[in-house]
Amino acid sequence: VGDKMKHYKLNQLFADEASSLEIPQFMLETGRSLFSEHVQQPLSKENLYAGFSLLDKDTVIDFDSVDSEIARIDIDDSDAMPKAWKLQGFDNQNVKKWFDEQPSDRKMRLCKDIIIKKLSNNNAVNDRDLDIYVDRIIQNLTEDQLTDMEQTPGIYALKINKKVNSLLNEYAKKMFYEWVEQDKISCLPSYKLPREISPTNTIASIPKSLYSEEENFDTEYERKVVMELSSLNNVRWWHRNIARKGFSINGAINAYPDLMVKTESGKLLLIETKGDQLENLESKEKAEMGAKWAEMAG
């Protein structure tokens, strides 16, 4: 597949300066080496999850909204399994029929097994802790909720997984700011722009692009922003950052800015073009992390 992908190189006008650019990222001090008293590596979520335990965490989950959750949840279209079976947690109708014929106590154990299986691929959570945590959740369910869970253990697994992820994110945020205060985390030049990129959908009609072609825009608003920026005399080049592949502000939550803009005065601007209509808790947390990055990067 890689050989068939088109590669777009840095524009020759900007290639030298872009190749020498190192963008600050959060770095974690990991100890000493033979050659230095300070050894650092790029901070990862896995670093921040160290020491996390579910044993002391709350089990407050809104299961009353299961019906609306089923109505709105999106399953990956590439999965051949029908959506209804994915939500129920069964592979097919025969398995569901067999499940319905089981006695109530066995159904409960099977539901728990389905939930544990769906959550057990999270390496940040201890399997034994997870088993105990799911037991605590099930013990607090009402009779109606237990009946619902028997019908759709898949959706209960999704809601529990969402809760576990929110607990992990809270813990990671707490550890991040603690380690910043303890000077375990710094913000140092680290990320280098690649010499070429390989977006699947590109645009080449806007001047001052860093690469010969850039990844195309998600919205018309984003395109207008870039058109305006490229027309400014003090803008040297712009680049559309490729989400999950390009530069990220690697804090307690990873933030991929939509655009990078280099000014003629040498400043590098990281720009998020999402409109107010998309503002939510996650985008606010990303904005906070971006502000902390800017403060520490200097």
Predicted features and spans:
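Catalytic cores and motor modules of nucleic-acid processing enzymes
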Residues: 1-256, 261-269, 278, 282-288, ...
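Catalytic core segments in nucleotide and nucleic-acid processing enzymes
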Residues: 275
